[in-house]
Amino acid sequence: MNTATKLLRGGVRAYQLTLSSVLGGQCRFYPSCSAYAMEALAVHGALHGSALAARRILRCHPWNPGGVDPVPPAHHHDEMKQNG
């Protein structure tokens, strides 16, 4: 895991330990958006993991029903690049 990924994961962890506990379980998805971000960063790295996390956070609003939304596997991104 590179330095950028570690820093981003540290930021998410800080959010989990501070604001998340104050705001309560508001996420409409499983896993929660912050847990999704942690996993996306670990699996896909800083750049692609951040993009996946941002996309997830933008979908977390009252007009989206939510539900189960796992982080795509690492090979999924590679296949998308190959298939254009």
Swiss-Prot record:
Keyword Membrane carried by entry: yes
> What does the function comment of this entry state?
Could be involved in insertion of integral membrane proteins into the membrane.
Spell out the Pfam families in the cross-references: YidD (PF01809)
Q: Which family does it belong to?
A: Belongs to the UPF0161 family.
| Name recorded for this polypeptide | Putative membrane protein insertion efficiency factor
Which keywords does the record carry? Cell inner membrane, Cell membrane, Membrane
Please give, as recorded in its UniProt entry, the membrane topology of this protein. Answer: Peripheral membrane protein
Where does this protein reside within or beyond the cell? Cell inner membrane
Q: Which domain of life is it from?
A: Bacteria
Q: What Gene Ontology cellular-component terms does the record carry?
A: plasma membrane
- Transmembrane ranges, per UniProt, are none
